[in-house]
Amino acid sequence: MKLSLVAAVLLLLLGTARAEEEDKKEDVGTVVGIDLGTTYSCVGVFKNGRVEIIANDQGNRITPSYVAFTPEGERLIGDAAKNQLTSNPENTVFDAKRLIGRTWNDPSVQQDIKFLPFKVVEKKTKPYIQVDVGGGQTKTFAPEEISAMVLTKMKETAEAYLGKKVTHAVVTVPAYFNDAQRQATKDAGTIAGLNVMRIINEPTAAAIAYGLDKREGEKNILVFDLGGGTFDVSLLTIDNGVFEVVATNGDTHLGGEDFDQRVMEHFIKLYKKKTGKDVRKDNRAVQKLRREVEKAKRALSSQHQARIEIESFYEGEDFSETLTRAKFEELNMDLFRSTMKPVQKVLEDSDLKKSDIDEIVLVGGSTRIPKIQQLVKEFFNGKEPSRGINPDEAVAYGAAVQAGVLSGDQDTGDLVLLDVCPLTLGIETVGGVMTKLIPRNTVVPTKKSQIFSTASDNQPTVTIKVYEGERPLTKDNHLLGTFDLTGIPPAPRGVPQIEVTFEIDVNGILRVTAEDKGTGNKNKITITNDQNRLTPEEIERMVNDAEKFAEEDKKLKERIDTRNELESYAYSLKNQIGDKEKLGGKLSSEDKETMEKAVEEKIEWLESHQDADIEDFKAKKKELEEIVQPIISKLYGSAGPPPTSEEEAADKDEL
């Protein structure tokens, strides 16, 4: 049965793909694959038959998912933002992925707020981020907007490498992300000016990276993906380019950040015990500790102890402690062990024994932790995990392959992806019972219908409440959305026939329809979780804001560039006037004095007018040129000014 279902789904998929191609034929250009991570993001492209992971402007292949706003009003994204976290913690935003698609009341949001250095406020039952964007201006951003800024950075990284505009992308999400989180991620893409052609699950993308070139018959692959903020386990069968997800499980709130947090809390307590001082009051000190703890954690993957040294940590005092691997493991042992539960669950759901697993693929930076590797190995009775792929880049690699498929690249071969919905979907029926329509681990895309009726006589309206989760009662599950079907003709209870249809698309996003079979009256809802989801108007406003930000960034850069040009020119002249071997030795004392005075004047003006606008900087440079050039022309006759002044200075970027 299962095989024929798969074959049918395959035919359906290939059929729809072809039909879509016939319909579309639009040129989507180069489609990029983006791994939008909690702590780091990565972008890849399928080019000339292979995947290229693209380095950012700092030369790094992964980019911190950080956005910062400086007091001068500059917006920094990526490495530059992360590097100034300790000096500007209140306005440096990270971990947006832990807030995206969640409600304000979500216990995990409430837990996170305690440890985030920036302000998180409630707006329309959602967590919004409040920062000072410079010039004493406060602004609130939805988590989608912060994620959009990171996506924009990845888009620009790809554009710089490709030398052309990028408009279409495949973006990855944790397999265990629910409907609201997937929709919100798609919205973030829209705000960043990207058409997100497909949302794919991270472990599935990693499996593509692992199995793209494996052609030796059917294999069972277990992907264990533990990143900075989320954890997924997926079990797939790979068979000559067909990747079928059999089961998936995980925790969308478990990762390296939680391990860091445990260590930080340990040291904060220790410091209080030793000095009586509570560091938590000082945001900067806590962020300095965060930075050093993360460094120490990485070091402990290859050594048994690491020193944590922080100069002027708190109230001028230094911090110096040792963290051993054993202590790190002890502080996190319950979290490490909890990663085995989803592994067990996935095996149960797919009716497989441990010995049936052919390969274990470790993905995500946190799988470098020796204890995690040891626990996985012990769970699988000593079986060594596969070491063939880069845990940081595998997800973006797989996304880039899928992007290649969607852009019609012939070199990707016959790649077919069959993914599943991670959670059971259903509706509430009398007594608050969860009536399941689509069980978890059903292959998507899928469509299921069921007939329901009214609960009381002459009931004119039925309210359809859509839930996801595994518990028998809806109160224990997650409400996705609600809608009404009205205009039901008066009839005794149980007589009207109401057909409810659930349809999940390839992105794992759900659409629900209800139809009164008697009247043909229909109502539908794309589950966009109205309280949770941005409205089209909000998205449009955010798109405009994002464009405005890009414009402001450009203006700011232009202002800095013109300021630097004036500064370089002035200092270049100052150095030449002072050099007796060069210009200084050739000028008459009168001309020298005129030039020195003009140069000093401009340097002083610069020091007191850091915030002047572009026109002012240009005007001051012109004034200086008008004084200097006649003197230099006189000196050199008609040979023109010496080449080492303005032209050379203007060509050099100041550091």
From Swiss-Prot:
Gene Ontology CC, one term: plasma membrane
Description of post-translational modifications: In unstressed cells, AMPylation at Thr-519 by FICD inactivates the chaperome activity: AMPylated form is locked in a relatively inert state and only weakly stimulated by J domain-containing proteins. In response to endoplasmic reticulum stress, de-AMPylation by the same protein, FICD, restores the chaperone activity.
Extent of motif Prevents secretion from ER: 652-655
Pfam families: HSP70
Enzyme Commission number(s) of this protein: 3.6.4.10
Cross-linked residues, Glycyl lysine isopeptide (Lys-Gly) (interchain with G-Cter in SUMO1): K354
Modified residues (N6,N6-dimethyllysine): K586
Residues annotated with N6-acetyllysine modification: K126, K214, K272, K327, K354
Region of interest called Substrate-binding (SBD), as start-end residue ranges on this chain: 421-501
Enzyme class of the recorded protein, top EC level: hydrolase
Family note: Belongs to the heat shock protein 70 family.
Domain notes: The interdomain linker regulates the chaperone activity by mediating the formation of homooligomers. Homooligomers are formed by engagement of the interdomain linker of one HSPA5/BiP molecule as a typical substrate of an adjacent HSPA5/BiP molecule. HSPA5/BiP oligomerization inactivates participating HSPA5/BiP protomers. HSPA5/BiP oligomers probably act as reservoirs to store HSPA5/BiP molecules when they are not needed by the cell. When the levels of unfolded proteins rise, cells can rapidly break up these oligomers to make active monomers.
Protein name (record): Endoplasmic reticulum chaperone BiP
Organism name: Bos taurus
Gene label: HSPA5
